[in-house]
Every structure is written in C-alpha cells, then in structure tokens.
C-alpha cells in the first residue's frame, strides 16, 4: 500500500509507485495533465490497492478520456466504498459496452439506491431493454420525487426509440415536444433527428427540421435532398448510444452553473466512452473542457469530429474557442474567419470572430464583424446585444461619435436593458458629455439591476463627477462591498472618500485597488496613496 515517506529527506526509488504518484501530483499542480495521467497510470500499476492513487487516477482518467484507467481506478475505490456517484454511471457505460445487460440492470438498481442520478433510471432501463431485444418503453412513476426531472429528458428518448421501431407518427410528435423543451444543443439535436427521419423515408419532415440559409445545416440539407449518406446518419441508436445521449444532455444542462462544470465534463467523457463515434458527446466535452481551462483536451475532442461532416461546423466552432483558450489566437482567428466567410454564415460565427478581434485590439475589424452579424435581421429587430457589441468596439477603437449613435439605437430597441443603459451612460460620463441625461440612464440601469456592482459603481462615479459627493460615497461603498477585488471600483471609492474629507479611508481604498491594478493604474494609485489626491491623479 502506498504511504508517504516517514521523513522529508528520505530517498524515493525513481521506479516506485510512490515516485510515480508524486510526479503525477506535481504535474497536476503544474498544469501538465498528460504527464499527470501517465504518472497515475504507472502508480496504480505499481500499487493497485492504493486508495489515494486510485482516487486521483479516477478523476484524471475521466477528465483525460482514458476509460480503461478510469474503470480500474473505480474498481479500487468501489472496494472500499469510496467510488464517486458518477462512477456508477461509468460502470454502467462499461457494462453496456460489454453488452452485459444483467450487470447493467444491477448497476442501475445501485444508482437508484445512491439517489444522485436516480432520475435517469427509467430511461436507462428502457435502453437496456433495447439491448436485450425485448423493448420496454420508459415508465416514470408520477409519485416519484424525481418524476418532473426525469420527464425533462423523456421525449427525446421516446423519439429515438419510436424511430428505431419505425413508428414515424409517434416519433414526430415526440421530436416536436423534445425540440420545444430544449434551449441548448438545438442544432445537434435537429441534425440527429433529421438524419433518422430521412433514412426512414420522411425526407420532407427531415428537411423541415433544418432551417434553410443556415450554414450549420447546409451539408445535411444537401445530403438529404440527394439521398446521400443517409444510412450513416440514420442508424438506429443502440443501448449504449441512447445512454450516451442521456448523459450528454445532462452534462450540458448542469454545466450552466460553473460550480458543476467538472461533473459536466465527467458526464460528457463517460458518454464518449460508451459512444466514441458519436459527435455530440465530443462537441459538448470540447465546450466544457475549454471553459474549465483544459484547452489541450478540448482541442483534441473538437478534432474528433470530422470537419467536412454534418456536425463539422459545430465542432469547428468549439475548436475556435479551444484554440483561443490555449493561447493559439492567430490560429483561432484564422479558423473563425474561415467559418464566417462561408455562404449563409450564422450571426454567431461573425460574433465569435468579432470577439476574438476585439480581444486582440482590432476594434475596427471587430466592429465590422459585429455589423455583419446584424445583416440578417430587419432594421427594427436587430438584437440589442449585437448593437452593444458593435458600439463597444467602436468606442474602444476611438470612434466615439459612431459608437454613440449605435449605442443610442440599442437603447431605443432595449430601453429596459440595464447593460445597454450602463454602457451608454458611463461612456458619456467618461467624456463629460450629456451629463444630466447620462446620470438618468445610470439611475434607471441601477434601479433595474440594483445588485450589479459594476452598474452601482457607474452611477456612484457619475454622481461624483457631477458634484453630488454625498450621494456618490454610499453608492460607491455599496459597489465596493459587492466587488471587493475590483480595482476600478476601489479607486473610484477612494477618490470620492478623499473629496468627502475621509482621507484615511481613501488611502485604504486606494491600497485595496492597488492589489489588483497593473501598469499606469498601479502607478497612479501608488502616487496618490503616497502624496494624496492631485488633479493629475484622478481616476480615468
């Protein structure tokens, strides 16, 4: 059994399990997941009974996509009752891969007893029955405390199972219900349903799922119209693929909350274990890995989906994000340009390009991309967010007059959107223009979103620069309480406190701001903390 050395100076055999484990821990801390994975694999082989090695190996293996190591680690943890709840899902995936239907059913029973993922049981059992060759539709007990949660996932699987059984009328009804309930991954779901319908002769119904003049669907529409590649995209889902669809959807759903992002990655990885050729799990995993800081793995996952295929555009979009997260910004921008240049490119492609260009300080290019994204909308129905993006790029690119016109248009279209009101109001305050109207915009924004520290700061700073110090100080104190690590807010508070005669507190606020400030701002804060407030030291 692996144990820590008795003394800090004790030598460790470079070939030992302990050495491999320590190397893995160091690699974990240094952000070298590949080395960490190899080290934990070696450590577990050298000491297969070590719970600590198994625990770290399990998490690293699932995140990294090594199913064999994940299953070995899970077996060690299970023997001591330490297997994480998602480990049961992993073991179900393993049983489905082996076509061990009785074993899969026993594991589902355990999943129900454990509680966390019990709501997945009716649909999972139904897919197991598909594998057994004696199909039984999912049955959700209305008295079950998880019934409402399980029903969120039901229609999608009823549709796939009806398609498998050739029951097109019931499949179409379930498809319509499933699409009506979904808010994410809509394009991928439309594609898989369209492929299934087209392969069963429902060509018109398949095409109806794929909007015209959208690049994401161009290849699929062309193939369906010509009858090409339908056997590939219309294969009936297996038990494992059905389970993978369930986990992929759950991974996407729970990962809107950053606190559950790592669990979402593990679920998407398990889905890919049981359906390695399915594109959706790889696309979702790429997205979640990128957002969680695992850019190298995200790139690998996105590239698992063939670029020329039906799902290629969706995977390439995630590849852009992963490349940017990995610091490969030139490559990301090049790919984003290529995706935005195709016929009928969706607005999202232009927005993605614009955001990357803005991050590289190419504000004119960014504004142009955001403007192009608006082209497909009627003039009075352009989404306010696209106008805000364009206005922000123009403002940062020193084209204030054009920016103001765009931002004012956004405010007319979205008069109760606090983000728009805040940007337009604060930009005018910064330039000391239209001050009274700008303060009113910020008051309205703050009333609409009183808990937003950034908006509270904007209003407090506007009150300060217009001379209402008595109103400004408590407003800025509230902003700083809500965002204590924000350098701009703390500097604003310090300036206002100084003007109110509260010099000690002002210096305290400036010191708090200096902790997070850089460059010119850090120099300015140091100067006024040392010398006191002077006109040339005023916050920008």
Task: Show the residue positions of the predicted features.
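Terminal, low-structured helical/coil segments at or just beyond the last alpha-helical repeat
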Residues: 230, 234-246, 487, 499-540
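Structural motif corresponding to the intra-repeat A-B loop/turn of tetratricopeptide repeats
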Residues: 30, 64, 98, 132-133, ...
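Repeat-based scaffolding regions
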Residues: 28-32, 51-52, 169, 224-225, ...
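Alpha-helical adaptor scaffolds
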Residues: 127, 248, 320-321, 423-481
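Residue-level recognition of tetratricopeptide repeat
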Residues: 25, 59, 93, 127, ...
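N-terminal leader/linker segments that initiate helical-solenoid repeat arrays
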Residues: 3-57, 62-72, 82-83, 106, ...
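Alpha-helical repeat scaffolds
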Residues: 67-79, 101-113, 134-148, 168-180, ...
């Amino acid at each position: 059994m692996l144990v820590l050395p008795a003394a800090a100076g004790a030598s460790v055999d470079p070939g030992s399990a302990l050495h491999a484990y320590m190397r893995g821990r160091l690699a974990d801390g240094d952000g070298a997941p590949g080395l960490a994975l190899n080290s934990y694999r070696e450590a577990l082989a050298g000491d297969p009974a070590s719970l600590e090695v198994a625990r770290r190996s399990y998490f690293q293996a699932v995140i990294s996509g090594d199913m064999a190591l994940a299953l070995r680690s899970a077996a060690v943890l299970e023997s001591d009752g330490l297997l994480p709840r998602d480990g049961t899902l992993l073991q179900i995936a393993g049983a489905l891969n082996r076509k061990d239907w009785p074993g899969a059913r026993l594991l589902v029973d355990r999943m129900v007893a454990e509680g966390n993922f019990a709501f997945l049981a009716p649909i999972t059992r139904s897919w197991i029955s598909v594998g057994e060759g004696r199909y039984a539709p999912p049955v959700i007990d209305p008295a079950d405390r998880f019934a409402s949660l399980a029903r969120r996932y039901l229609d999608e699987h009823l549709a796939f199972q009806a398609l498998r059984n050739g029951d097109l009328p019931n499949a179409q009804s379930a498809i319509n219900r499933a699409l009506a309930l979904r808010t994410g991954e809509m394009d991928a779901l439309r594609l898989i349903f369209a492929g299934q319908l087209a392969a069963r002769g429902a060509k018109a119904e398949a095409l109806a799922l794929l909007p015209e003049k959208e690049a994401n669907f161009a290849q699929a529409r062309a193939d369906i119209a010509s009858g090409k590649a339908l056997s590939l995209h219309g294969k009936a889902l297996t038990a494992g693929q059905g389970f993978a669809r369930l986990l992929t959807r759950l991974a996407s759903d729970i990962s809107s909350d950053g606190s559950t992002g790592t669990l979402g990655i593990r679920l998407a990885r398990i889905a890919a274990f049981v359906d390695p050729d399915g594109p959706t799990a790889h696309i979702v995993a790429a997205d979640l890995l990128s957002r969680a800081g695992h850019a190298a793995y995200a790139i690998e996952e996105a590239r698992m989906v063939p670029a020329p295929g039906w799902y290629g555009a969706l995977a390439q979009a995630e590849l852009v994000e992963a490349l940017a997260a990995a610091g490969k910004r030139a490559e990301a921008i090049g790919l984003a340009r290529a995706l935005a240049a195709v016929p009928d490119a969706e607005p999202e492609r232009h927005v993605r390009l614009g955001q990357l260009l803005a991050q590289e300080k190419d504000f004119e290019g960014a504004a142009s991309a955001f403007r192009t994204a608006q082209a497909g909308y009627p003039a009075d129905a352009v989404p306010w967010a696209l106008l805000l993006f364009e206005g922000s790029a123009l403002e940062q690119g020193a084209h204030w007059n054009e920016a103001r016109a765009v931002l004012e248009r956004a405010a007319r279209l979205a008069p109760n959107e606090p983000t728009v009101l805040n940007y337009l109001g604060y930009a005018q305050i910064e330039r000391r223009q239209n001050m009274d109207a700008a303060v009113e915009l910020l008051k309205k924004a703050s009333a609409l979103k009183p808990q937003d520290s950034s908006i509270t700061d904007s209003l407090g700073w506007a009150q300060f620069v217009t001379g209402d110090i008595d109103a400004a100080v408590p407003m800025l104190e509230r902003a700083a309480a809500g965002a204590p690590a924000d350098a701009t807010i703390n500097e604003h508070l310090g300036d206002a406190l100084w003007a109110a005669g509260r010099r000690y507190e002002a210096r305290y606020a400036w010191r708090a701001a200096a902790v997070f400030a850089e460059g010119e701002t850090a120099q300015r804060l140091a100067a006024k903390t040392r010398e006191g407030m002077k006109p040339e030291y005023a916050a920008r």
